[in-house]
Amino acid sequence: MTNYRVESSSGRAARKMRLALMGPAFIAAIGYIDPGNFATNIQAGASFGYQLLWVVVWANLMAMLIQILSAKLGIATGKNLAEQIRDHYPRPVVWFYWVQAEIIAMATDLAEFIGAAIGFKLILGVSLLQGAVLTGIATFLILMLQRRGQKPLEKVIGGLLLFVAAAYIVELIFSQPNLAQLGKGMVIPSLPTSEAVFLAAGVLGATIMPHVIYLHSSLTQHLHGGSRQQRYSATKWDVAIAMTIAGFVNLAMMATAAAAFHFSGHTGVADLDEAYLTLQPLLSHAAATVFGLSLVAAGLSSTVVGTLAGQVVMQGFIRFHIPLWVRRTVTMLPSFIVILMGLDPTRILVMSQVLLSFGIALALVPLLIFTSDSKLMGDLVNSKRVKQTGWVIVVLVVALNIWLLVGTALGL
């Protein structure tokens, strides 16, 4: 009986520690459901029904491995990816890395900020500029939580992630997808046309987010409690749960678009405004409102994460720190310029995804090199199978992004 009590007590202690260490992956997972993903998944579902759902499944599995590697680097070395690059690469290379990482973080933030502004515009009936002002105010308020430490921010962003997931459960109920066809689309690969191949590449290419790779390693570098192996074990659970939720949201986005648009003849729906306006008569005003609210939640949380990532790359690469409110103010400016110039927000969103593709290999390659170095990682070094899988993902993602880039440049 005494032994049972001891085992039960130690089991509870282990679960309590695991729960205490969870949270960083929920911040990272927000990067996988930003407005760029909304646009890509809606277009894919409207154009090809359930046929590209399998791409979301595989993209999410790849992203899980990459986020585990990023988190593991922080746990094993006590330094984030940007700091490791600073310590191991020549100074000109480090400065190049910092500049490209800042540009990519700002380009990503542009898409996320405008996405949230579009959401406010749709649900409140305000102008896009007024939506941008509301987005700016809301992100400032969320970022103020950082003063109280990482945990309050993790809870708010985790709550927004769960809200988006709940919103898409509601959307699935409204749209009533064919479950047999949905299951088939998730399991059986299908690329019926060259446009489907291009969209599949877009789904995969927009999934791996370089700024989140830098950020996740910084969120885990200061974790305390238990041994390194225990922290790593808790982190794997953290990543598995958070990324499964993000994967579900992406699947639900595409499935809802397929059920609502593709099978009702609206195969040309390609932007967020059009999706909202088309949902109203097809499903209901409530379904359209839920879509708008989920877009606001995803946009706000992902733009906050983008601001945090920008802070990490600046501190990591060049040891320079500016207050978060200054960074937030500066990174908002491109969004307001785009809106005031009257540029097409959806086109800007797509262009930002293309720019983001430049940074993927630059983040993935050093991540794999560092996590495969036994001197750096100790007992958490990558296994041979993880190394091989990692390099396959690098080659695949880089090749697809180059292809997307060329295709976009040629207007394919």
Curated annotation (Swiss-Prot):
Periplasmic domain ranges by topology: 40-51, 119-125, 176-196, 259-276, 345-350, 407-412
Compartments, as annotated in UniProt: Cell inner membrane
Reported effect, residue 238 to N: Transports manganese to a very low level
Positions on the Cytoplasmic side per record topology: 1-19, 72-95, 146-155, 221-238, 298-327, 371-387
Effect listed in the UniProt record for changing residue 115 to A/P: Loss of function
Name of a matching Pfam family: Nramp
Membrane-spanning intervals of the chain: 20-39, 52-71, 96-118, 126-145, 156-175, 197-220, 239-258, 277-297, 328-344, 351-370, 388-406
Signal peptide residue numbers: none
GO cellular component: plasma membrane
Single GO BP term: iron ion transmembrane transport
Domain of life: Bacteria
Keyword Translocase: no
A GO molecular-function annotation: manganese ion transmembrane transporter activity
Keywords annotated in UniProt: Cell inner membrane, Cell membrane, Ion transport, Iron, Manganese, Membrane, Symport, Transmembrane, Transmembrane helix, Transport
Membrane topology per record: Multi-pass membrane protein
NCBIfam families, per the entry: nramp, Nramp_1, PRK00701.1
Similarity annotation: Belongs to the NRAMP family.
Function: H(+)-stimulated, divalent metal cation uptake system. Involved in manganese and iron uptake. Can also transport cadmium, cobalt, zinc and to a lesser extent nickel and copper. Involved in response to reactive oxygen.
Protein name (Swiss-Prot/TrEMBL): Divalent metal cation transporter MntH
Organism this protein belongs to: Escherichia coli (strain K12)
Gene: mntH
